[in-house]
Amino acid sequence: VDTFFKISERNSSVGNEVIGGLTTFLAMSYIIAVNPQMLVAAGMPFEAALTATCIGAAIMTIAMGLIANRPVALASGMGINAIVAYTLCLGGVNVDWRVAMAIVMLEGVVIFILVACGLRKAVMDAIPASLRHAIGIGIGLFIAFIGLKGGGVIVSSESTLLTLGDLSSPVAIVSIVAIAIAVILQVLNVKGGLLISIIAATIVGIPLGVTPLPTSWNFGLDFSAFAAPFQTIPGTDTMAIVQVFLQPALLLFVFSLLMSDFFDTMGTVVAVGQRGEFADKDGNVEDIQPILMVDSAAAAVGGFCGASSITTFVESASGAAAGARTGLSNIVVGLLFVVFAFFAPVIGMVSSSATCGALVVVGYLMLSDVAHIDWENIEHAFPAFACIMGIPMTYSITNGIGFGFISYVVIMLVTGRAKEVKPLMWVASLAFLLMFILA
């Protein structure tokens, strides 16, 4: 095991990998409850949605560990599942959920081809170092914001958009406890501190009524959503994937999902890489091609399984911060997904308040890259700023990256330095511009 996963070579241990895997799993475990809810809204049976979510995540997370040997876990991506449910199935498009999964699968196939041709890595290499740092910083703010919002520390406001929540509420109290424990253990350099904070906050939440207790157990698996793109649409004789080509307008959604997957993963991998010590100070990720290959295949597998697009999870950074350095942590995460396909109510006990501390600390750790940006050089600093602000403020990693790319190209153009912009940056920026226009 040590030789295969290079555990000692990367100054890790089996214990660190297990703790890192547990931390990552708990930080991303909300997807077990959230994704099926989204897919049920789209018309999929709950049991099928739960099985697809857990088994799809397990397969691709383990594949990432075995093939790329990096602590990068995968599951159904937030954002794309919302597009599937509320735009494709319930919005004006109003297609059957099987057709939506066919669109997701096609998007994954296209990305896989682009990665195989080296285009995705080439785009990453074309991104200026300042923007690579900005992506990680923006994601850090995004993660911290998600933690604070989910924990009731920050709440929505009609007058000011956001405001301070009721800190005397049980939800906020558990969140504050989680943050305090996570920060204190980080200061004391306690291994597995983030995991300890999640478990401790979950226990504290029981008497306060914040931690939901299991009321029933689901021991069955339902694979009826698997091969969804090749299933016949109810009431017709048409296979779902054929319907996509019978309605050419649906191919625009293939492009839209592709843009989101393409750049979300780039930002996530850089962010996790810097926490897991496999990305350098300029955001260049070591041995990135296998990571991108598995991630691109995951999108297609997600559509095939009926789980929506499966993608790398930025919550993997919490596991990396807890000590994960190899793919062994992915094996832990993958096996836990399989287990909780049967025992989903247990994961339901981990509330957003319990994970608040881990997400806030990870967000803090990711802000350290601010020091690597030359803030005196506005040609590079402003695009970085646009990216950093755009990610949390639009609740989208893709949008933030798009703001950074487009502003960088425009600034270099008007200052007469267009020749310094690499061709793929022009292409990517134009693609983002098209995406924003069509949105």
Describe the function of each predicted region.
Residues 42-62:
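Loop-to-helix transition at the N-terminal end of transmembrane alpha-helices
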Residues 93-207, 211, 331-439:
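Membrane-embedded alpha-helical modules
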Residues 1-48, 162-164, 196-289, 433-434:
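Helix-loop-helix hairpins and the membrane-proximal interhelical loops
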Residues 2-35, 56, 77-139, 272-370:
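Helix-loop-helix junctions within the multi-pass membrane cores of secondary transporters/permeases
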